[in-house]
Curated annotation (Swiss-Prot):
Domain of life: Eukaryota
CDD domains reported in the protein's UniProt record: Atg16_CCD
Effects seen without this gene: Does not significantly decrease the growth rate under nutrient-rich conditions. Strongly reduces conidiation. Causes only mild infection in point-inoculated spikelets of flowering wheat heads and impairs the spreading to nearby spikelets. Also reduces strongly the production of deoxynivalenol (DON), an important virulence determinant.
Gene name of the record: ATG16
Subunit structure: Homodimer. Part of the ATG5-ATG12/ATG16 complex. Several units of each may be present in this complex. Interacts directly with ATG12.
Any one Gene Ontology BP term: protein transport
Protein name: Autophagy-related protein 16
Coiled coil: 24-177
Family the UniProt entry places it in: Belongs to the ATG16 family.
Membrane topology: Peripheral membrane protein
Amino acid sequence: MPNWRDQYLSGIKDAELNNPVNMELVQTCSQMADRISALEAEKNGLETLVTTNGKTTARPTEPSTNDPAVAQLKQDLAEALRSKGVAEKRLRSSEEELLQLRSKHKTNTRSIRDLTADKNSLTTRLKDREYELREKRKFIEQVQDEMIALNLQMSMAEKERDKVKKENKELVDRWMKRMAQEAEAMNLANEPIFKKGR
């Protein structure tokens, strides 16, 4: 059955594979776990050695507290445990920060998706508006061209009307002059008859 260090190390590796947080932190934890394992193995070996060598003494099960190796081992173990606590604290802090960043990432992703949809909608509306404006410009240009053509036609019609009016007036004037001449000629021709009748 794996001990707590192996489980802890395996859990860190699994977490790192599934959710990479901070490789440096994971490596530090792994190194500390290895160091703790080595120190505890060394401690067990020293305790066994002290127990074996001290069977003839009055305290066979307790290693000598004055042994510098044991003291150093305890100091190293305490330092390793302290470093482990610091690393675990940093790991928890990193995991919390990761959760916050993931939550923020989801929010940002949703915002980006919404903004992209708004942008696409506005782009479509803008294209429709540009198309509408182009068509209106074409229509205005057509109307202006038609107005110019109508003005030209009207100007030509007015000139034609003035010409016809002038020709009619000249024709009427000639006809009136002719009628007057014919009337005068008739009067002159009938004047001897009028004189005889008197």
